[in-house]
Design a protein with these regions (language model features):
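Conserved post-Walker A coupling segment in P-loop NTPases
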Residues: 1-45, 49, 55-71, 136-141
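Conserved helical "switch/dimer-interface" subregion of ABC/ABC-like ATPase nucleotide-binding domains
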Residues: 17, 77, 81, 89-90
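Structural recognition of the conserved hydrophobic beta-strand(s) that form the central parallel beta-sheet
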Residues: 27, 63-64, 100-107
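Conserved catalytic core of Hanks-type protein kinase domains
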Residues: 56, 81, 104, 126
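Catalytic acidic motif of RecA-like/P-loop NTPases
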Residues: 68-69, 79, 83
Length: 179
């Protein structure tokens, strides 16, 4: 889905309702890191030691946001870990077994990246078992009332104060031309 449609919230909801809910939820923004840094983050290091994101997500969920930005090398590493269930830290030869749910996310069509040769076809088929497209808010206006109520509930819980929204403010939100 487009930026800001709630992909992270959906991924966390999937995690929280799954058998992995008691395990960790590890999130990686693939666009924010250079290919070298993302490889280091995913694989970890024995120097330090710095566990891999795969290890940190063991028995939980690894969420890769903006997966279309992964380099070919990182795609190969990810595919290998998914197929073998083993990770080797970047400066080691030791195989570490890992088990995690992978949720990947993109703001554009991964299928188009595959057709252009910019994304591994093999990895695409490995990660696209259950595709969910989240439409932007402008296409699901009927969700607004529930979202407003959920946000108010969340802030009431956080602040332990009673909060309400005025009818005028509610109308402004419901009538706003959302992107």
């Amino acid at each position: 889905g487009e930026e800001g449609v709630g992909k992270l919230s959906l991924a966390m909801a999937i995690h929280n309702e799954s058998e992995q809910r008691d395990g960790p939820f590890i999130s990686v923004d693939c666009q924010m890191l250079s290919p070298e840094n993302i490889l280091h983050e995913l694989l970890g290091s024995d120097v330090g030691p710095s566990p891999s994101k795969f290890e940190l997500a063991h028995n939980g969920t690894l969420y890769l946001d903006k997966v279309e930005y992964l380099s070919g090398e990182v795609q190969s590493v990810l595919l290998k870990v998914l197929k073998t269930g083993l990770v080797t830290r970047s400066d080691s030869h030791r195989l570490i077994p890992v088990r995690f749910r992978l949720i990947t996310c993109t703001s554009s069509s991964l299928r188009e990246y595959v057709q252009q040769g910019a994304f591994s076809r093999q990895l695409y088929y490995e990660i696209s078992m259950n595709e969910i497209e989240i439409p932007p808010l402008r296409k699901r206006r009927e969700d607004l009332k529930q979202m407003i109520d959920d946000i108010i509930d969340k802030y009431q819980e956080r602040t332990r104060k009673k909060m309400t929204i005025t009818p005028d403010a509610n109308s402004v939100l419901l009538e706003y031309r959302w992107p």
